[in-house]
Amino acid sequence: MRYAIFSDIHNETRALLKVLNHAREQGVEGYFCLGDVGIDDCVALVREAGAPAVFGNWEVSGWPHLSPENQAWALGLPPFRKEAHFWLTHATPLWPTHLTRLADLNANRRDVPLSQLFPYLHFECPALWEIMVSLTQANMPLLFHGHTHRQMAWRFTADNHLQKLSHSRIRLRPGDTLVVGVGSVGRPEDGPGAAYALYDDTLKQIELVRA
């Protein structure tokens, strides 16, 4: 199956429409949204696309600005999703077990430092190492994330090193552990064009693309 995985729309409805139209042209069969959606118009497009979503840091503070229907949608979002062969999150899949949706986080805001829940993975940092270890222990080869507004990928090598990948097309090899940043639809910080990722789970191939 071929998926489009996108994140960080930040109220940019036109950019999201470009991504959705571009993805359809690529023969995409399913969508995932990794948070920081923004206004009601953008939420409506995500929901119309049938895209399972996770919440990002925008939703943590921005959900009260949505319509009542979309507030309920946002408050029910999880911080990460575990599919059969890949995981998806806004920033990290390592969350306290009692925080299973945005409403739980809102009820426990004083007890949870948000900086730990929304790390930036575009450089080699302790959070990235912790995620790689967690993926390896779970025998999970692939994580997609947003939040950094940059397209990039890291591979955990057999000799326990982190390798930053520079290609826009990446093949998931047997034994690999990959962390892939899909970039930003609405506010990319690594060049022009609305950025997102395509993943073909039959070919085991990731493409970092722009609409």
Predicted regions and their residues:
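A structural micro-motif
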Residues: 1, 49-51, 141, 177, ...
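Beta-strand-turn-beta hairpins that frame and shape the catalytic cleft
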Residues: 1-4, 81-88, 172-179
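N-terminal active-site segment of His-dependent metallophosphoesterases
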Residues: 1-49
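Active-site neighborhood of phospho(di)ester-bond hydrolases with catalytic His/Asp-centered motifs
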Residues: 6-7, 30-36, 53-57, 89, ...
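Glycine-rich phosphate-binding loop signature in dinucleotide/nucleotide-binding domains
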Residues: 23-28, 83, 136-139, 198
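Conserved catalytic scaffold of divalent metal-dependent phosphoesterases
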Residues: 41-144, 148-158
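Acidic, His/Gly-rich catalytic cores of divalent-metal-dependent hydrolytic chemistry
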Residues: 155-211
